[in-house]
């Protein structure tokens, strides 16, 4: 979601919760199994792997939102293109099938882009993101994808004096970037939307919707295939080179090779330190009865977040559960979560920590069952800025680094890749999207281990300590530990 900490969003896991293949925890909680979003309908039927060497006009590596949206818009724009998507597991195995279901207008690094390219350039990026929420809903409707979409907006709440100060600053900044339809609420108005214990204020934007992540990715994959795009699953790409995507089963040769791997980028040869695979974890309750919802409210089904440094994110699902997430164990040494596919479930201590947040926000949920827990990785560039790139000399392109805000951002990134390829191939000139400030942004790699591990864990330890200190502090100033952590992170 849009981040007061990072100006332009690194907040709630829009494109990044999910790993794990475990079963139970002994408490009635299904732990792992991809995510809660697959619990009812199960894993989709597998598509055939790559049968051998092949050629294409465009080869897309990664069958999540970024890859599928890119295939969709390219094929719509140029129907004769031969497009192949290579997916290591199945479409939606990664963050696209595990995230918090936040379709919203946050984009990681917007404030940094304002510094680099000017305020008006960043305003254009923000407007494009605002419009993207409606674009995703439009395509879902056009393609008859039932993804439980409900456009209730996004509500960010503050529960301490320091959080309230950050909220007000965040609200002012968002308006300065053109979001003039955003509204600021006091404690009473906040409670009229959602009764969060201790909430002293909130900021609401209409540019957001709740959705079911797996339903969206499954529907999008089907729509892409219906257009004539070839999808090969169970086909891990081990190396990307100009005009070559190399797999254990053969090599796909194409003028354009697009890397759309987000949190799994570290699995590719030579890309271990490009984007850090940050972990995020979630829980989903049992369906809650009417008497509990009467105490909570939340009738507008806004996506819900807070202004803590180690923030939470949540939605009220279509079947009246609360799905809630947070950072949990933030990073595994050596980018291991990406390289090994995922650990065997979410650590019990993380599950209990998320339950504590749930009950702290909504005390009447104290006795409810947690039906599912899962965890996963999202992609974080060293400067925390999402980017879209096409190298015109090599034909290599990539998009990502959404820092957990990818459900909508992937769509804008895909349309931008489409325009960049059409421009490069001489089919069009520059467009509004190809001139956005995140295009062809360059960033250095992450530090080698153990500095990477120490930095990330030190940062989140500082955030959690700062949040704890702020709960008892009357001062509106953010705790010094959090400010120090922001400097360590390079935000």
Language-model-detected regions and their locations in the chain:
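Flavin (FAD/FMN) cofactor-binding and adjacent substrate-gating region
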Residues: 2-14, 26-33, 39-40, 109-115, ...
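Glycine-rich active-site loop/strand segments that organize a redox cofactor
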Residues: 98-128
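Glycine-rich Rossmann-fold phosphate-binding loop(s) that bind the pyrophosphate
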Residues: 62-66, 88
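Helical element adjacent to the flavin cofactor pocket in flavoenzyme catalytic cores
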Residues: 165, 172-176, 198-256, 260
